[in-house]
């Protein structure tokens, strides 16, 4: 197995993520009224390219090393592939934490599977963080089995467009490959998003258009 260099950051990672096929979908999405963000991201598409996934893992491994992490823990489900890549890049044991409220086997299966996390410093890995509700719940699940979450590593940090951020997610050291607004900027710069649509989208997000704002009609809806 070829050793992975985790010593130097890859400055092109944000662009590679933003331009991953299918990650940014042209058009707007208003899943529940005026909820932002307006551009849905299919972040699992960043995992399709093995070279990109390996480099994402290297960035996470650098962060894990800085924090003195004992175990890398992937958040079910979208954080698991990225956490595995971080584990492989850094040579750090891997585990994953079940999604709180998982139905079907909650009485038969432990909340954390894989490496033992009791008494360990762990890095929580997920695809994104926005309001931080998921981070709080996963952190509580890990604390319940004796683990200490010392940091969070995500593909995309979306806290800048969240209406509010949970105190737990705000306080934990967090590193991301890119941010939501940077993804949109890079997607527009590389021809994935129409520049006019992009400008309207950013305005909608930053200025929080109301539900009855007529400019919504100017934004094509995502399929």
Where are these regions (language model features)?
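Structural motif
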Residues: 71, 121-123, 151
């Amino acid at each position: 197995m070829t050793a992975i260099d985790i010593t130097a950051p890859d400055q092109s990672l944000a662009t590679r993520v933003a331009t991953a096929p299918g990650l940014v979908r042209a058009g707007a999405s208003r899943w529940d009224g005026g909820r932002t963000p307006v551009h849905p991201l299919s972040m699992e598409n960043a995992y399709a390219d093995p070279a990109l996934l390996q480099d994402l893992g290297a960035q996470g491994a650098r962060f894990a090393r800085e924090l003195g992490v004992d175990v890398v823990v992937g958040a079910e489900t979208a954080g698991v592939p990225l956490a595995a890549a971080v584990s492989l890049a850094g040579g750090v044991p891997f585990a994953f934490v079940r999604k709180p409220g998982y139905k079907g086997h909650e009485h038969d299966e432990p909340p954390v599977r894989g490496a033992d996390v009791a008494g360990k410093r762990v890095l929580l890995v997920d695809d994104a963080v926005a309001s931080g509700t998921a981070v709080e719940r996963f952190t509580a699940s890990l604390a319940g089995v004796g683990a200490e979450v010392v940091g969070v590593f995500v593909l995309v940090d979306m806290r800048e467009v969240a209406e509010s951020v949970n105190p737990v997610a705000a306080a934990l050291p967090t590193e991301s490959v890119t941010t939501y607004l940077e993804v949109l900027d890079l997607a527009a710069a590389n021809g994935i998003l129409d520049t006019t649509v992009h400008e309207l989208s950013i305005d909608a997000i930053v200025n929080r258009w109301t539900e009855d704002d007529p400019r919504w009609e100017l934004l094509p809806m995502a399929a």
